[in-house]
UniProtKB/Swiss-Prot annotation:
Designated name of the protein: Large ribosomal subunit protein uL1
Pfam families: Ribosomal_L1
One GO cellular component term noted in the UniProt record for this chain: cytosolic large ribosomal subunit
UniProt-listed InterPro entries: Ribosom_uL1_bac-type, Ribosomal_uL1, Ribosomal_uL1-like, Ribosomal_uL1/biogenesis, Ribosomal_uL1_3-a/b-sand, Ribosomal_uL1_CS
Family: Belongs to the universal ribosomal protein uL1 family.
Alphabetical keyword list: Repressor, Ribonucleoprotein, Ribosomal protein, RNA-binding, rRNA-binding, Translation regulation, tRNA-binding
High-level lineage: Bacteria, Pseudomonadati, Pseudomonadota, Gammaproteobacteria, Enterobacterales
Gene name in the database record: rplA
Assembly notes: Part of the 50S ribosomal subunit.
Protein's job: Binds directly to 23S rRNA. The L1 stalk is quite mobile in the ribosome, and is involved in E site tRNA release.
Annotated GO MF terms: rRNA binding; structural constituent of ribosome; tRNA binding
Organism for this UniProt entry: Sodalis glossinidius (strain morsitans)
Length: 234
């Protein structure tokens, strides 16, 4: 049996794996246990009551967190003409068409998000085998293929998170950094859960959001009591 590290022993002693913590208590615990030499991210895992084997029950989308993620996001935009100028004005880091595609083909990936206007998909489509495996391929379902590229750039810069369930029906994403104020992490989590509820497949039956767990980059998962969260959809 592998020997537990000092950090793992502390986590084991502090975290009750059978308990659902109030959000404030959960965040306080994460902050206490975040002892890495860098500012850890606060990640969330949401277990959904879906059958991930069925395509009509898969959940995918994007939402802007009210307090961002704490990450600096570099955005590349495939577009031209007036849209190119609008994208630059909105803060895009890279804007182009064939020239941008050539950079990517050479292995230059100086960006975290790729956005494209519909007329640019003829160029972007050639990059599917490069961008797809990296999770960077623009998709209208998450708002990264859009005629309004300026708005998409602003959303990406403002802290938009993209989500997609895995084969077990679990959503994994980030809701900020461990040095965020507790209320901001709570509001970010609530915004994500509201977005997930709005994206609920009509075919999904029974309890939809089954479990919510928070963790830091190097920490253990802490289950959150959903009754302490405001997730009513409009």
């Amino acid at each position: 049996m592998a020997k537990l590290t000092k950090r793992m022993r502390v986590i084991r002693d502090k975290v009750d794996s059978t308990k659902q913590y109030d959000i404030s208590e959960a965040v306080a615990l994460l902050k206490e246990l975040a002892t890495a030499k860098f500012v850890e991210s606060v990640d969330v895992a949401v277990n959904l009551g879906i059958d991930a084997r069925k395509s009509d029950q898969n959940v995918r989308g994007a939402t802007v967190l009210p307090h961002g993620t704490g990450r600096s996001v570099r955005v590349a935009v495939f577009t031209q003409g007036a849209n190119a100028e609008a994208a630059k004005a909105a803060g895009a880091d890279l804007v182009g068409m064939d020239d941008l595609a050539d950079q990517i083909k050479k292995g230059e990936f100086n960006f975290d998000v790729v956005i494209a206007s519909p007329d640019a998909m003829r160029v972007v489509g050639q990059l599917g085998q490069i961008l797809g495996p990296r999770g960077l391929m623009p998709n209208p379902k998450v708002g990264t293929v859009t005629p309004n590229v300026a708005e998409a750039v602003k959303n990406a810069k403002a802290g938009q998170v993209r989500y997609r369930n895995d084969k077990n029906g679990i959503i994994h994403t980030t809701i900020g950094k461990v040095d965020f104020e507790s209320d901001k992490l709570k509001e970010n989590l609530e915004a994500l859960l509201v977005a997930l509820k709005k994206a609920k497949p009509t075919q999904a039956k029974g309890v939809y959001i089954k479990k919510v767990s928070l963790s830091t980059t190097m920490g253990a998962g802490v289950a959150v009591d959903q009754s302490g969260l405001s997730t009513t959809t409009a």
